Amino acid sequence: MEAKDIIHPEDAKAIKAIKGIPGLEKAIACFMKFGFEKQFRGENLGNMIRVDAWNYPVLYHDFQELVKKLGIREPELYIYNSPYMNAYTYGETSTFIALSSGLIEHLDREELKSVIGHECGHILCKHVLYKTILITLEEAGYLFGLIHKGLFLPIYGALQYWSRKSELSADRCASVLVGEEVFQSALAKLASGLKSDKRDNLIRQGRAYEEFRKSSLWKSLIHI
């Protein structure tokens, strides 16, 4: 599988706009200079459990299979303690995927593959650099008020918009890897925390949301 096979048009359009932002190259250079990736890896090793052939070998086997199918370099895989079901991928040069313990407890084996496949999709589509910059800007904004003062506001806003669109491409990747039925089952659990066998109802709800999202009132309130 190649990135061009799964990248959503909205994702491609948004990332093209980001690359045209004045000052982006300087922001990237600043990011790389301060070595935020090393900080992330240190926090992972100190506060999470790394998944490998000895720790959670079945999960690691499934993870390796997905990585091979996509033909990407194997990132590090970690589990962190949180009851909330979540996963994320950061690190351009030292890439890692982190899964919450809530995911491990609530999703079955195939559904976990769907989540991991989604995160691997971000890697395949080369989203990780920009996602890492986004989270770094968010942390810097809270610490130093940079975002609130407007220093990086144009870049931050564009990255936020693109980040939402990038999820469409990652979802495509997950769906291709595990199939639509498993993918939809995982989404239902992520949304409600409960198992749902009513796939048709989920699809109808998704269509209803899409119609609502396109409404002029909704667009005037929030852009997604």
What are these regions (language model features)?
Residues C120-E139, G145:
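Catalytic Zn2+-binding segment of zinc metalloproteases
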Residues G141-D200:
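Metalloprotease/metallohydrolase-associated module, dominated by Zn2+-dependent proteases
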Residues R50-W54, L99-S114, A158-R164:
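Short pre-active-site segment immediately N-terminal to the catalytic Zn-binding motif
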Residues M1-T93, Y156, I224:
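Hydrophobic or amphipathic, alpha-helical segments that drive membrane association/targeting
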Residues L107, I116-C125, S169, C173:
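Active-site His/Glu-centered metal-binding helix of metallohydrolases
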Residues T93-T95, A140:
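Short, hinge-like loop/turn segments at secondary-structure boundaries
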Residues Y80-M85, L103, E138-A140:
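Short glycine-enriched loops at secondary-structure junctions
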Residues G23, Y80-T89, T93, L177-I224:
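Active-site-proximal gating segments in proteases and membrane effectors
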